[in-house]
């Protein structure tokens, strides 16, 4: 069996736009008629630029090759242009192509892919959600200062809606999303606001529901530590990307200074970057995205690294339907 053709799609995602403003898909077609689908999670360039890069990579490394040869595909693409280093744009494209190959393999074997990667482990998994507006776009008008991202009462009310739906954790940016976003030290007033925002949600949902801090790397190490100390009494389950992900040692400083578990990974790719996170004790919860990390087999390898370090996985699910299924 070989892959004889492919097709790419950029699909707009109408409001409320859960998972992104658009999705980028690839379809691989084999000479036996089996079709596999994959999805790129990449916002580094415009959608159609990413689509052109996807086409180029598929033409050079996928067409004419056996979809079962996952390791060969991975090594050829990862080493393209004599680079052989983590590159989030290239590895996102590789993720989509690898995912589509696994789709073909599963169909050819008449087996769900999870059975080919070790089989089912859990009967049930916990599920969390970000606190989104109850209606309208997840990207509200910037002039609106009364939505769930900044109004603690509205956020608390929405959190209760999610609890009623069966979610056991809710995620939000305690810094009043994007209001503390200068890459540095939060002011005393900003710390007060963050604490009040978090406390209001904790009071609403009680102690049985976990709170997840979905920050976006907007603090310096010292600023993140100050915020963590303020919020530790409210018993959050994790503090996500307290500092930018490009300095693992800085993240490790934060991890060593707070009792809140640190989570990271949505902007990382390949086992090499995740291995560094684990070796430096920078995070104990890994948030890999299947459309960016390097594909299913690469995710399986990262899961093995996490197992060795007694870390946990919480896959990043801001994505389209194919990455979500993967």
Question: What does each of the following model-derived ranges do?
Answer:
Residues 1-13, 77, 81, 107, ...:
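N-terminal amphipathic alpha-helix/helix-capping segment at the start of soluble metabolic enzymes
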Residues 1-43:
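Structured beta-strand/loop patches that form or line metal/cofactor-binding pockets in enzymes
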Residues 39, 94, 190, 213-220, ...:
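Glycine- and other small-residue-rich loops at beta-strand/loop junctions that grip anionic moieties
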Residues 3, 33, 58, 97, ...:
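Conserved, mostly hydrophobic/aromatic
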